[in-house]
Regions:
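Conserved ABC ATPase signature
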Residues: 133-137
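Conserved ABC transporter NBD signature motif
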Residues: 60-71, 76
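Conserved ABC ATPase "signature" region
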Residues: 100, 104, 111-129
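ABC transporter nucleotide-binding domain
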Residues: 176-267
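Catalytic Walker B motif of ABC-type/P-loop ATPase nucleotide-binding domains
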Residues: 158-161
Length: 307
């Protein structure tokens, strides 16, 4: 395996009596996208902040490009690109000016930045908006501008904290296309997300965290095979909940109830589907197990207080 571009070892962060990150370790190889998924309050954003040197860990180490955070913070940040959850674009500057001003923070000369701006705007599909201010942009345009800004210094590693939250499906797909282009160029990405389709589409590996602890790690399809039965049958409609205590329960390896829906997890859905034909008033959906099933199995279906 290639040498890690980012290595996190035994990170711990406490706030008072609460441990929000507990003995967390992971690494990212060059050209790899590592996704971090978990419920609200699982410690994802705190982990990103420690990787950026914005939050000091109580225990553990962060090493990037062979350098140590926070001792070598400036040298590390010169090779990082960051897209945070919140919009941090300057509302008083145009798109092009946002890129120019941001590049100056890295000590880049104006001429060097101006040379990069046209390609960055083209990458973000914002060439026609070069002179527009952020307030004139859609949500998707703002996120793409934030991504373009994160690329001003030509970073080796991108840290993206829920980069597509709040975007409509079309804007999310366009953002995914841009991120896939960056991966094809050999850049590395550390990504937090609540979208399981995003995680499956972009990430080579996933880190599942809950209550600040790593509870699973691996390639998306490998994790699904490891933790889940291959077939899922969702049943809903009048009388569906009664099936949870019916003889059909024996036809599934595992059964879950959420709201008005019963989820049957099985290695072979055919006998179950045949039995369900006796309940024409019910609606059924037969599908393969996916990352959302994995997420819910490992972290639970209960909504967290800060969700």
């Amino acid at each position: 395996m290639p040498e890690s571009i980012l290595s996190v070892q035994n990170l711990v962060k406490r706030y008072g009596d609460a441990t929000v990150v507990s003995d967390l370790s992971f690494a990212i190889a060059p050209g790899e996208c590592l996704g971090v998924i978990g419920p609200n309050g699982a410690g994802k954003t705190t982990t990103i902040r420690m990787c950026l040197g914005l939050t000091v860990p109580d225990e553990g180490t962060v090493t990037a490009f062979g350098l140590h955070m926070p001792k070598d913070a400036l040298a590390i940040k010169a090779q990082l690109g960051v897209v945070s959850q919140m919009d941090t674009l300057d509302p008083d500057f145009s798109c092009a000016e946002n890129l120019l001003v941001y590049g100056r923070y890295f000590g880049m000369k104006d001429a060097q930045i101006r040379e990069r701006i046209p390609a960055l705007l083209e990458f973000a599909s914002l060439t026609a908006k070069a002179n527009a201010k952020p307030g004139e942009l859609s949500g998707g345009m703002k996120r793409r501008l934030s991504l373009a800004r994160a690329l001003v210094n030509n970073p080796r590693l991108l840290l993206l904290d829920e980069p597509t939250t709040g975007l409509d499906p079309q804007a999310r797909h366009l953002m995914w296309e841009r991120l896939q282009l960056l991966l094809a160029e050999g850049k590395s990405i550390l990504l937090t997300t609540h979208f399981m389709d995003e995680a499956e589409r972009l990430c080579h590996r996933l880190l599942v965290v809950d209550h600040g602890k790593k509870i699973a790690e691996g390639a998306p399809r490998d994790l699904i095979r490891q933790y889940l039965e291959p077939d899922v049958v969702e049943v809903y409609g009048s009388g569906a909940l009664a099936l949870a205590d019916s003889p059909l329960k024996a036809m599934a390896a595992r059964l879950e109830v959420s709201g008005e829906t019963v989820f049957f997890y099985t290695a072979d859905a055919k006998p179950l589907l045949q039995a369900l034909a006796a309940y024409p008033q019910l609606r059924t959906l037969h599908r393969p197990a996916n990352l959302e099933d994995l997420f819910l199995k490992l972290t639970g279906r209960q909504i967290r207080e800060d969700a």
